[in-house]
Amino acid sequence: MLDRLARFFTSLRLTVALLACGLVLVFWGTMAQVQVGLYQAQNEFFRSFFIYWSPSETGLRIPIFPGGYLIGGMLLANLVVYNFQFDRPGKRNFGLVLIHIGVGLLLIGQLLTDVFSTESMLHLRNAETKNYSESSTHFELAIVDKTDSATDQVVAIPAEQLQRHGVIRHASLPFTVQVQTFYGNSVLAEKQQAGFAQINVSAGFGAGAWWRELPKEAAMDRRDLPSGIVELLTPQGSLGTFLVSAHLNQPQEFDCNGRHYELLLRLERFYKPFKLHLVEFRHDKYPGTDIPKNFSSRVRVQRPETGEDREVLIYMNNPLRYDGDTYYQASFDPDNHGTILQVVHNPSWLTPYFSCVLVGVGLLVQFLRHLIEFATNRKAS
């Protein structure tokens, strides 16, 4: 049995089949982005073990093709088993072993990036200071205890949890959150329109307004705007039903047990132990044209607990790497008075560099070994 498994995982046919499946997957996933958008295509094709097909109105999910995790995992197993079975380390194949380790590390690094990396955006206006960045696609229901004027106590509930409906409890809250309705993408209207339903809430904003669920956005320059109705419940009774929506920019206020709270559905936040202050944003153009020459943001990094206070210039191809995050110059406001920085947190960002070095050294060692052997044999003859 073990011999059969070893022969299967060391088979060259398996390697070729997996590489062919990888080519099909990349082409298929790239084309699917037109219909479902980049992020959904990544999750369905590349960050999954199988690609599923769902017959209309059945709710079934039938696997029809291997996904990125399965293909990558099988390639890694093929590589590891082959080395243990046939390519045991030695002087003659040291370069080949380095190449295989580099390729394997590249596969593992991609998995670690998918699992642990996060991307967010930091929008700063001139002279503005923030200690958090925001997701560009994911939302959260923030319940903020504003009783203490010096410190806010925040409980954030991911929108994905709201989509499952049910009752949500948290040890820091004297009430529970009952999700009555939640739409992953929606539109609101002040007056009745065709296909819209009336919003029935007893507190906060939205009473008398109308809403409708929308399909998920596929365009890269647009995002889903979720909305829902939640009821806040205490052992003594209901605090009211509230409309929570990404369309609402102002928090809704309420009191419970002598404490003052705010309720807001907002983009997911990633708080930092430091602050970034925008000193100046520059958008330089070539003289006499509208062609951009340079985008740059001069920011001040402030960390009171360590006394750090310094200025850093961020521009294209010159990001700020700080505290495990990388800040790239991504965009800017149309009036040139604000900047948008892309924030990437990737603990395994060095893995591809190590992989390329190992593969390069392995190729060099293998080439030099063959060259020396060829020169020696030719001299001997």
Name each model feature, range by range.
Residues L2-F9, F46-F49, W53-S54, R88, ...:
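Solvent-exposed, low-complexity, intrinsically disordered
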Residues L18-G22, G109, Q329-F332, G362:
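Short hydrophobic alpha-helical segments that form membrane-spanning helices or hydrophobic packing faces
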Residues V115-N346:
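Soluble non-transmembrane domains of integral membrane proteins
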Residues L2-L23, G95-V103:
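Alpha-helical transmembrane segments and their helix-start/interface "positive-inside/aromatic belt" motifs
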Residues A17-R88:
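Membrane-embedded alpha-helical segments of integral membrane proteins
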Residues R13, P63-D152, V179, I340-R378:
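Internal alpha-helical transmembrane segments
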Residues T10-V16, N43-Y52, K293-D309:
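Hydrophobic alpha-helical transmembrane segments
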Residues A32-T58, I62, V312-F374, R378-S381:
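Membrane-proximal extracellular juxtamembrane segment immediately upstream
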